[in-house]
Swiss-Prot record:
This is Polypeptide N-acetylgalactosaminyltransferase 17. Residues 151-262 are annotated as: Catalytic subdomain A. InterPro entries: GalNAc-T (IPR045885), Glyco_trans_2-like (IPR001173), Nucleotide-diphossugar_trans (IPR029044), Ricin_B-like_lectins (IPR035992), Ricin_B_lectin (IPR000772). The chain crosses the membrane at residues 7-27. Substrate binds at residues 192, 223, 381, 386. Its EC number is 2.4.1.41.
Amino acid sequence: MASLRRVKVLLVLNLIAVAGFVLFLAKCRPIAVRSGDAFHEIRPRAEVANLSAHSASPIQDAVLKRLSLLEDIVYRQLNGLSKSLGLIEGYGGRGKGGLPATLSPAEEEKAKGPHEKYGYNSYLSEKISLDRSIPDYRPTKCKELKYSKDLPQISIIFIFVNEALSVILRSVHSAVNHTPTHLLKEIILVDDNSDEEELKVPLEEYVHKRYPGLVKVVRNQKREGLIRARIEGWKVATGQVTGFFDAHVEFTAGWAEPVLSRIQENRKRVILPSIDNIKQDNFEVQRYENSAHGYSWELWCMYISPPKDWWDAGDPSLPIRTPAMIGCSFVVNRKFFGEIGLLDPGMDVYGGENIELGIKVWLCGGSMEVLPCSRVAHIERKKKPYNSNIGFYTKRNALRVAEVWMDDYKSHVYIAWNLPLENPGIDIGDVSERRALRKSLKCKNFQWYLDHVYPEMRRYNNTVAYGELRNNKAKDVCLDQGPLENHTAILYPCHGWGPQLARYTKEGFLHLGALGTTTLLPDTRCLVDNSKSRLPQLLDCDKVKSSLYKRWNFIQNGAIMNKGTGRCLEVENRGLAGIDLILRSCTGQRWTIKNSIK
């Protein structure tokens, strides 16, 4: 501490001296100042010293030499902070420029345990500089755009729980290095009750010494989950704009200005930087194509193709309308985020909140878009920190979204999860406050959202019954889509997941398989009797020439009979050879389907 204070005193004294020289020079002769915002770019320290070769006077040369000396002193002091943690700062080394980093065979052996623990190669991460640069994958036009100097300031919020220290600090360094100083209000680190000791005192001491006054650390007293942890970060933010990021990202140069400019134009826009991938094994940065963010009816997020009007415009730098968000990064006006109810605090852990925000923003007067001119690279981990029964939490959260925002289309979420509409067996908590919020904001209905924001989403309003289909002669097995390439339905021990999701429609079609997502991707297939084979086929409904061959008569606890052939779907017991699913003349076998829609 004493040595650090001496450095600070020395720095202040020298800066005063330098300021005197600069004022003296300013009065003696004009000094050309570079325009633009290059001051916030990362530069090798030697670059300042090299400018002395172009000095116009011995006095200016002395000033530049003094600045170079000061920079060396400060750099050595700050770099010592990272060295004490076993980490690296600077501009070279492994993984520079987003290239794949490697380990020796001996190091590879040491890396196995940490890799399994974190879901990425944390041992390798410690060998990569906190300041490394990554590729600039922005469209060419983006690099030519100019932005106002009077943009709003941003508070960058990182959420972490038991993350590798090197990965967190690289996220912080990258944010500082690639966000203009006058636009970066603060960085907020929200620790969702981590167990790792290095994420406590060592982390706090480092960020407060390395970036004094810039970084706040918020500690949750119990594990809240990503959703509520982000809300805690928002509560302490003071910037006009808040950016929420996973704590395993790296920023591309120029990422902030286009985001803040779009929000300055319209405070009700939620902006998503385009996402690139950091490979979890070697930290290579891999470009992802420009995409919108959509979701399935289970409310699992996914990348989808940008809308047709974006493609028709022929300009890859334009914003991309998106129905929802993947969730690893989003930026929003702080007040607007509060006005629309933040994220749903009644949700647990994570999953579904990203879909809820997209739906809510669009229905309640805002918009959401992906910006190709702003890019953030993100590690897709093999292992998640909140991995205890995450499927249950996602299901529960999805039902909250359905009950509050989806009107009659809420049935699609229940169908996708194979749950009854009434008494699904999951306590989703009280949603009255979220419904009251929707009413107070005078939000549109979900039909409008599907028609205008997510028209690509497949709809299944014609469903009358769904779930596992069981035969009274073989109750332990269910109708199953079997291997996709065989195009034949089979019987398989009941498990209730997607391959066994049967859906009977008003038209008499019998679909089998998980619900489809967008019209650009395959839909669930139809059960077909082609009149020739004893085996029931699963085919693309639109490609079946005879409508009758894909229509079935079925009532609960009754036969399933094809309208075109009159044959029934039945099971045949072949003794030790097993049970087959076949088509034949009806013998009175009966089928039951798990759920119905009244």
